[in-house]
Amino acid sequence: MRSASPLAPAELRGNRLWMRNYAISLRSWHNRKKLLREGGYTMKQEKAYYHLPGLFEFYELYREFLPLFRTHREYFYDWCDIGSIYGAPADCVWGGGRAGFGEHDPKEVLALTREYGISARLTFSNSLLREEHLSDKKCNALCALFERENPVQSGVIVHSELLLDYLKTHYPQLYFVSSTTKVLTEFQQLRAETAREEFRYVVPDFRLNKAFGELDSLLQAQKDKVEFLCNECCWVGCRDRKRCYENVSRKNLGEACPEHICTAPGAEEGYRFSKAMENPGFIGIRDIQDVYMPMGFSNFKIEGRGLGSALVLEFLLYYMTKPEYQLHVREAIYLDNMLDLF
């Protein structure tokens, strides 16, 4: 059966930004199908690496999940692995993206990632930092600890150029990730960002996820840096995304500011994975295997720091766990014969 070309949702056809990227995607659709059939993508990746949310926030979940991932590898897809776990403790001035709420001892967190050979990332993506914030004792202590005590290199997700320059000077053993909070919606922005030597990874705005023609024009070294945000639930026509992130940055700085009110359709429902799956920018496991890996991409970010651990577990089940073993994982982590929901 022939695959149908992707259709633009009717409610988005007036949004110029999304329609531009949609047009690029549509133009490349048939060429991409032809290349896949003919084996035209010569840099096919053999392994996808997931960058998972909640280093501090979901420590208890990972303390149960990671031993299972190691001892029962047959439960999980052999084409994927864990590239990193990212997050930030509560009350970090440098924090951004989401307000951190993790309370676990950073040494315990690092001990867990060290035991399983996983890179730990600090989410320090505040976009509004000033010179006086660079001396923050808590954030500096975290960077020093992460640079010193993890044999697998640790990283920092960063937005501020001021902070990036500071970290490069004071913590040169850390690697750096360009944050999705920059809201890179223009492909030339992404191309330029991936050309920067200081960034090992770059997370573009999710609205570039399906710009296949342009994405495939990147050099392989640039493709290796691109880290796609897979499960975003934000409305694809949103024009307030950067302001939303700035609101979080102000809160982390302790500034008095009004709550950002999301005006997107269905915003009152909050995050729903089923809704995210309907997002035109959603990247599912078939997309990863059949499109992105054959094109030469291998890094995929799962969002979820501000959600509950039950939903994050569902992400781990969907993206990493074979369907026939998903119940096994639930039973190993929380499900027993006496659990009541109501």
Question: Could you say what each language-model-derived stretch is?
Answer:
Residues 12, 35:
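Cationic, low-complexity basic patches in intrinsically disordered or flexible, solvent-exposed regions
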Residues 14, 39-40:
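Residue-identity detector for glycine
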Residues 3-5:
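Short linear segments in intrinsically disordered or otherwise low-structure-confidence regions
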